[in-house]
Amino acid sequence: MSNPIIDIAALRKSYERAELNEDASHADPLKQFDQWLNEAIAAQVPEPNAMTLATVDSKLRPSTRVVLVKGYDARGIVWFTNYNSRKGLELAGNPYAALQFHWVELERVVRIEGVVEKVSAEESDAYFNSRPLDSRIGAWASPQSEVIASRSVLVTNAAKYGAKFLLQPPRPPHWGGYRLQPDNWQFWQGRKSRLHDRLRYTLQADSSWLRERLAP
């Protein structure tokens, strides 16, 4: 028996878990992000550190993908990847990017915009060396974003580099970290009747943050 056709347009949810107001939110968006991320972790949201990364190519065509945040502080949000991947090449041509976290279970979204730079070689080395061995070999084995004939290419490459490096693969020169330095944050909390809470933080010339409420 075939499944009934789902009416996508009729799918909707009422958001009633929480609220976000100026008095209860932090004046510093990094502190607000830290609070929300830790609440997502405590709520056992699947992969709470997963975020969508948006970049733009030389023809102004945007692209997105999901990456994992591996660190954050006053300097920005950090993730690691292949510098020769599509996102790496696009960031080399246009360093401005946007991030989005969507914690469905908490009815929350965080959007972050800013300029991106590579982290230091020392930071990349430290994180690379903390990864499981198969992940380190995988960084060598996968020519990310390139066309390959079949999955066997990856399997063969992994075996080759595993035999070459044994237990001590060095960090590939084409692999490392990026840091997005935020100049704009938005925090969205779902509310009843689609009257959601939405706060925007904009970086000012004196390095302070302007907090404003936006209509949802």
UniProtKB/Swiss-Prot annotation:
Keywords: Flavoprotein, FMN, Oxidoreductase, Pyridoxine biosynthesis. Belongs to the pyridoxamine 5'-phosphate oxidase family. SUPFAM superfamilies: FMN-binding split barrel. GO terms for biological process: pyridoxine biosynthetic process. The gene is pdxH. Pathway: Cofactor metabolism; pyridoxal 5'-phosphate salvage; pyridoxal 5'-phosphate from pyridoxamine 5'-phosphate: step 1/1; Cofactor metabolism; pyridoxal 5'-phosphate salvage; pyridoxal 5'-phosphate from pyridoxine 5'-phosphate: step 1/1. It is an enzyme of class 1 (oxidoreductase). Binds 1 FMN per subunit. It comes from Polaromonas sp. (strain JS666 / ATCC BAA-500). InterPro entries: Pyridox_Oxase (IPR000659), Pyridox_Oxase_N (IPR011576), Pyridoxamine_oxidase_dimer_C (IPR019576), Split_barrel_FMN-bd (IPR012349). The keyword Oxidoreductase applies. FMN binds at R65, V66, V67, L68, V69, K70, F80, T81, R86, K87, Q144, S145, W188, R198. Homodimer. Its EC number is 1.4.3.5. Pfam families: PNP_phzG_C, PNPOx_N. It catalyses: pyridoxamine 5'-phosphate + O2 + H2O = pyridoxal 5'-phosphate + H2O2 + NH4(+); pyridoxine 5'-phosphate + O2 = pyridoxal 5'-phosphate + H2O2. Its cofactor is FMN. One of its GO terms (molecular function) is FMN binding. Substrate binds at R12, K13, S14, Y15, K70, Y127, R131, S135, R194, L195, H196. This is Pyridoxine/pyridoxamine 5'-phosphate oxidase. Catalyzes the oxidation of either pyridoxine 5'-phosphate (PNP) or pyridoxamine 5'-phosphate (PMP) into pyridoxal 5'-phosphate (PLP).
